[in-house]
């Protein structure tokens, strides 16, 4: 199968390596402002990996020419933070062809709909099937351009939904060889809500701001950054997320329970579960507060949850407090920026029942 991977960061290189390891012909694309891994993969002819997946896997092409990456592609993975989805969609728009599958990996806030909007596709358009995953399939870090370390490949708790959801089974069948543990979600509201990053990352970062600024992230983010008090904040945010899911008729698995299913954690608790987690061992904190744990997971993820809660009548006082505090720390108005909400996706006028019907 011919696979195009858009995004050459941690996740993109992880997806490209794994797909190539399963015998697929992989092309890697990124924008010109991100040349590091593209140049390295061009020079080396592929991607090197260490960790639970090891070795070297060839990549057919790596470059900044989107038409070359998409030509003949059966599956297109858009892999990057939430703010990459719209640019990926817009650059793909003239080159997408009928029958292709696009998977936004991961989506924390309606990434599949954001891609459809950016690519000029109708919500119910099935000529090009667009889907999203609930999270990245790996804990992965770039060691250097073109060289990655995969700490964990999810053993379960990885969900996928297409728009409309009736195409979910078809997409799963196409990716089953690489992701055998991937499961069908009810719809993209479930995949969007099941992403735990907005629950975990902002809380841990917020409670460790002094340590991050003082040490430039020279500590283990999960093993050293989580204490019982930090765990209580994570749990409070998680409760509000789960309540939104209940109102929308979708099951949201509590984050520690999901962490055990995925193979990150050995126990389903909000404190020691992270502190002793085998899948997070060795993962360092970010070197700066100006990082996706605030800019994406608050600016997109938590703002999306807060606005969605408002829409369906679920109070989110803890989520709102985290947004307010982080906005003050970063001298930004994340709520006012409203980078991605149900309104920006074109879905703010619908009730919970109407959304369920619309996305089915």
Predicted regions and their residues:
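Short mixed-charge
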Residues: 45-59, 127
């Amino acid at each position: 199968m011919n696979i195009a991977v858009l995004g050459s960061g941690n996740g993109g290189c992880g997806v490209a390596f794994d797909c190539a390891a399963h015998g697929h012909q992989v092309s890697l694309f990124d924008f010109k402002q991100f040349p590091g891994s593209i140049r390295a993969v061009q020079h080396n002819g592929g991607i090197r990996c260490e960790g639970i997946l090891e070795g070297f896997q060839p990549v057919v092409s790596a470059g900044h020419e989107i038409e070359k990456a998409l030509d003949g592609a059966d599956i297109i993975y858009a892999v990057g933070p939430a703010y990459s989805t719209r640019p990926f969609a817009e650059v793909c728009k003239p080159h997408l062809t009928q029958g292709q599958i696009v998977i936004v990996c991961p989506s924390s806030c309606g990434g599949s709909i954001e891609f459809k909007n950016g690519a000029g596709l109708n919500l119910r358009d099935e000529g090009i099937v667009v889907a999203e995953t609930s999270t990245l399939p790996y804990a992965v870090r770039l060691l250097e351009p073109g060289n990655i370390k995969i700490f964990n490949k999810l053993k379960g708790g990885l969900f996928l939904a297409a728009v409309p959801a009736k195409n979910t089974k078809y997409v799963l069948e196409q990716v089953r060889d690489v992701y055998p543990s991937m499961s069908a979600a009810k719809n993209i509201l479930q995949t969007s809500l099941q992403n735990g990053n907005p629950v975990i990352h902002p809380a841990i970062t917020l409670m460790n701001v002094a340590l991050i600024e003082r040490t430039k992230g020279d500590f283990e983010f999960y093993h050293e950054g989580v204490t019982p008090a930090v765990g209580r904040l994570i749990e409070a945010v998680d409760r509000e997320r789960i309540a939104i899911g209940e109102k929308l008729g979708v099951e949201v698995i509590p984050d520690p329970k999901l962490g055990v299913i995925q193979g990150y954690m050995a126990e389903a608790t909000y404190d020691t579960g992270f502190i002793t987690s085998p899948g997070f061992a060795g993962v360092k904190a970010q070197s700066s507060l100006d990082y996706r744990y605030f800019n994406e997971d608050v600016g997109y993820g938590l703002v999306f949850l807060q606005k969605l809660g408002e829409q369906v009548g679920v109070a989110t006082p803890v989520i709102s407090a985290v947004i307010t505090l982080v906005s003050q720390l970063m001298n930004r108005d994340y709520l006012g920026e409203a980078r991605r909400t149900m309104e920006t996706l074109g879905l703010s006028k619908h009730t919970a029942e109407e959304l369920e019907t619309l996305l089915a």
